[in-house]
UniProtKB/Swiss-Prot annotation:
This is Heat shock 70 kDa protein. Pfam families: HSP70 (PF00012). PROSITE patterns: HSP70_3 (PS01036). It comes from Sus scrofa. Disulfide bonds: none annotated. GO terms for molecular function: ATP binding; ATP hydrolysis activity; ATP-dependent protein folding chaperone; heat shock protein binding; protein folding chaperone.
Length: 379
């Protein structure tokens, strides 16, 4: 501990001097320790650590979608920003811009915390009114929809508090009495590559054909980062809710950064997988749309019996034969099957296109305790 304290003292000395001395009496078995170190040697030993301090700066600019030239002031935060080499690296990174040293680096974090506290308390003080301090979601939040797709409701870096609501058709199978809501965080296209936060079931749903727009899901993050997910059966008003605190099941800073890096490196293949599953879901949805339309009273006299039989045969073939044996088909193959179905008996003219089956089972958006997730019944 004495050696660590002496090294810390030398580091601070080198921020204002070009050389520092370390003296420790009886460091080990009665042997005194004495040495000196220059600022140049110190900077050489710590060069990799100093360079790594620019990584969060670059990340903050990327996340905010800002260029270095758009930054007005560069404020130093934290005692280590007193190190001359760190200041030089930062100044060079911003093309020689002068650093703002008007705030004590040790007190800068406290200033920010005080402003955040005032904002959360609704302080009307003039000093706070002109300040904008935003917190953001570290990863995208969403749920699993048909085909294991990650359907995002709250995007990464969305400012919080925030609330998003989306309607889902494709969560239900034919006459299914309940639906499982699985909540994930992550940037990958498929939920298997993301982090499961929790799951809950919305049960006792009245029997209904597959695809009827029934389930409304709301993601709500408050100022403390607590996530509430509510699923509501729109036909009955019955709802179920799950609440996740910011420290239960959530990823660490290092894991978040790893997931962001992985998402960037797998972006192309993730998009291809998302498109493939979307095409598969669109085909399945169109089949059920056509089968349902064939039984509508208003269309019975418009479709010749021969054409009706062809369509019914195709509707039986696609989900029970072709899809069963082609689970890993490419996007183009699913689209080809859908075009064939549309062409038989001019389905697109007689029945009209399916308006809800092309988005992996989702429409466009409309608008805890220490033991873990809490599931709450809401009548």
């Amino acid at each position: 501990r004495r050696l660590r304290t002496a090294c810390e003292r030398a580091k601070r000395t080198l921020s204002s001097s070009t050389q520092a001395t370390l003296e420790i009496d009886s460091l080990f078995e009665g042997v005194d320790f004495y040495t000196s170190i220059t600022r140049a040697r110190f900077e050489e030993l710590c060069s990799d650590l100093f360079r790594s301090t620019l990584e969060p700066v670059e990340k903050a600019l990327r996340d905010a979608k800002l260029d270095k030239a758009q930054i007005h002031d560069i404020v130093l935060v934290g005692g280590s920003t007193r190190i001359p080499k760190i200041q030089k690296l930062l100044q060079d990174f911003f093309n020689g811009r002068e650093l703002n040293k008007s705030i004590n680096p040790d007190e800068a974090v406290a200033y920010g915390a005080a402003v955040q506290a005032a904002v959360l308390m609704g302080d009307k003080c003039e000093k706070v009114q002109d300040l904008l301090l935003l917190d953001v979601a570290p990863l995208s939040l969403g749920l699993e929809t048909a085909g294991g797709v990650m359907t995002t409701l709250i995007q990464r870096n969305a400012t919080i508090p925030t609330k998003q609501t989306q309607n889902f058709h494709y969560l239900l199978q034919n006459n299914q009495p309940g639906v499982l809501i699985q909540v994930y965080e992550g940037e990958r296209a498929m939920t298997r590559d993301n982090n499961l936060l929790g799951r809950f079931e919305l049960s006792r749903i009245p029997p209904t054909p597959r695809g009827v727009p029934q389930i409304e899901v709301t993601f709500d993050i408050d100022a403390n980062g607590i996530l509430s997910v509510t699923a509501t059966d729109r036909s009955t008003g019955r709802a179920n809710k799950m609440t996740l605190t910011s420290d239960k099941g959530r990823l660490s800073k290092e894991e978040v950064e790893r997931m962001v890096r992985e998402a960037a490196s797998h972006k192309v293949e993730d998009e291809a997988q998302r498109d493939r599953v979307a095409a598969k879901n669109s085909l399945e949805a169109y089949v059920f749309h056509v089968k349902g339309s064939l039984h509508e009273e208003s269309l019975r006299d418009k479709i010749p019996e021969e054409d009706r039989c062809k369509v019914q045969d195709k509707c039986q073939e696609v989900p029970y034969l072709w899809l069963e044996h082609n689970q890993l088909a490419e996007k183009e193959e699913y689209e080809h099957q859908k075009r064939e179905l549309e062409q038989i008996a001019s389905i697109s003219q007689l029945l009209g296109p399916c308006t809800w089956g092309s988005s992996c089972g989702a429409q466009a958006p409309k608008g805890g305790p220490s033991t873990g997730p809490v599931i709450e019944e809401v009548d």
